[in-house]
Amino acid sequence: MNPIVSGASVVAAGLAIGLAAIGPGIGQGTAAAQAVEGLARQPEAEGKIRGTLLLSLAFMESLTIYGLVVALCLLFANPFAG
């Protein structure tokens, strides 16, 4: 394998997982903060808020997992290797 392609693949994999984790991380923090605020305002809606929060956290985390899959593909099943 060309050393330039190998190095670029490692850098791209690092960028893929790093950038894929930033957005969901910020979103999960914001969602959790808003859920705690909502629970403080309406404690009787705890079940509905918790269910919605867990579902939205799962969707946000899936974006990070997609970034991990792209990074692993670049590292181990590199389509650019000749």
Swiss-Prot record:
GO molecular function terms noted in the UniProt entry: lipid binding; proton-transporting ATP synthase activity, rotational mechanism
Transmembrane parts of this sequence: 7-27, 57-77
Key words of the record: ATP synthesis, CF(0), Chloroplast, Hydrogen ion transport, Ion transport, Lipid-binding, Membrane, Plastid, Thylakoid, Transmembrane, Transmembrane helix, Transport
Protein's cellular compartments: Plastid, Chloroplast thylakoid membrane
Additional free-text comment from the UniProt record: In plastids the F-type ATPase is also known as CF(1)CF(0).
Quaternary structure (record): F-type ATPases have 2 components, F(1) - the catalytic core - and F(0) - the membrane proton channel. F(1) has five subunits: alpha(3), beta(3), gamma(1), delta(1), epsilon(1). F(0) has four main subunits: a(1), b(1), b'(1) and c(10-14). The alpha and beta chains form an alternating ring which encloses part of the gamma chain. F(1) is attached to F(0) by a central stalk formed by the gamma and epsilon chains, while a peripheral stalk is formed by the delta, b and b' chains.
Name the record gives this protein: ATP synthase subunit c, chloroplastic
Organism: Ochrosphaera neapolitana
Gene that encodes the chain: atpH
